């Protein structure tokens, strides 16, 4: 029963479900029918709308094209506007507002580039022509502004301003010499390390303006115009500065015609001028050039070379004329001074005149240094030969130190003030030997050449005693001078001792030659009695009074003659003079005292003894003290 009821219920539900499905199918069929109807309508609508879509796309593209055209037109119009602005600034000129003027030129270049890349515009050619014409005008004004600005601030430097830049030790003295220190103070170690203050050639505020102008000219391709303007302006000013300082343009012929005193002064000035020119003027010029042409190194070097070449040539040509002039001993020291300054300035010259463009200038400076060194060496060699061959007829009648001796010794002593330079010469241009030994060797040869010449000059004396006195004086002067100078360290003690012995030998020879005869007159030798007997053992009883009187007369005559002659002779050195007098007295006075003691009584016992015994030993000693004083012939005895 229960099962049947469940089956009935289940059957009813199946009927309901079938009815629902059928209804749902009907709805689905209806929906499909409706959707199909919509699809047909939509297809028809799409077909109807297609022409409208095409027209809309075309309109959109047209709008985009219009936008692009408007934007391009705006750019073109802006370029025209910028061109008008640039033209206004260009026509106004760069003088009042250089920065704005340079901006206008930069803008013109951009405008030209723009129209060059957009030549499709109808007006592009006309605009380009106008812009290029405007740019050319702007650059011309720029060039003129550079020229005027550079000229306005380029003035010759007054000497006082240059002197202010020197270290105190190198400034001219306040007595108005103006030409600087003489070359005699030749080598100053402080000069190489002292601080120099560069003169202000162009105000620092102007340099950036000149740099900007130069940069624009380079960018415009006007390097040659720039170079010419800068060279003409600055080279003229530099030469004027040197002329105000005292530098002259002198040819070799001018130098050769000058008197030595005048030339020597000019050489001293030249040394001072070289130091000022290199360390102040050329260094300052390089600094200015590098700042104006910053970023254009090769152009900077070229400009600097062309600005300075004439001034450098003016200075070096004088040095070259001296180096090539006829050699003479007195020129050696100025040649060494000139060589020293060129060596002192070598580092600065290499630094200031850097770069390929300045190569010729550097080579010229190096060439002058070498020529000065070579000429100095040759002059040094000439001096040795000149000393040995000196044939001056200067007579030294009193046997004193010959002018040649004092000249040579002073020359050698002066050389030792330059020994550092001479050693450098031997080191750089010698044969490789030690520079000390080379200097010593040359000095010894000069001294030997002097001795050889003095030997020749001594033969002019007819009196052999004066010959030895002359050689004694001169060699003693050499020895004394060497002992008191740095030459002693170079020549050595052996040289000094050897030549002291030579001095003593000549003193001994003088004494022997001059006083032997009178010593014989004051000896007992040759005194015999009237009977022919000889004097023996100090006994004077057999001596002929007449012969004895003659012997005294002979002594008096000989002494008078010796005194008169030798009191006119000169021994200039006090110590040597006293020692020579003492040496004569030591042999003459004992002999005379002995002779007078033994034979004086015989003469005194006769008539007029004072006629024969003219001198006491004390008289002789006093008169010997008058020897070698260089008295005139008519000067009375004391």
Curated annotation (Swiss-Prot):
**Compartments, as annotated in UniProt:** Cytoplasm, Cytosol; Cytoplasm, Cytoskeleton, Phragmoplast; Cell membrane; Secreted, Cell wall
Which named protein is this? Exocyst complex component EXO70A1
Quote the InterPro entries the UniProt record gives: Cullin_repeat-like_dom_sf, Exo70, Exo70_C
**An individual GO BP term:** xylem vessel member cell differentiation
Stretches for region Disordered: 163-190
- Does Transcription regulation appear among the keywords? no
Key words of the record = Cell membrane, Cell wall, Cytoplasm, Cytoskeleton, Exocytosis, Membrane, Secreted, Transport
Instruction: Report the principal subcellular site.
Output: cytoplasm
Homology family: Belongs to the EXO70 family.
Q: What does this protein do?
A: Component of the exocyst complex involved in the docking of exocytic vesicles with fusion sites on the plasma membrane during regulated or polarized secretion. Involved in polarized cell growth and organ morphogenesis. Involved in polarized cell growth and organ morphogenesis. During cytokinesis, involved in cell plate initiation, cell plate maturation and formation of new primary cell wall. Participates in polarized pectin delivery required for the polarized development of the mucilage-producing volcano cells of the seed coat.
Q: How does it assemble?
A: The exocyst complex is composed of SEC3, SEC5, SEC6, SEC8, SEC10, EXO70A1 and EXO84B. Interacts with SEC3A and EXO84B. Co-localizes with FPP3/VETH1, FPP2/VETH2 and COG2 in vesicle-like small motile compartments. May interact with COG2.
**A Pfam family matched in the record:** Exo70_C
* GO MF annotation, one: phosphatidylinositol-4,5-bisphosphate binding
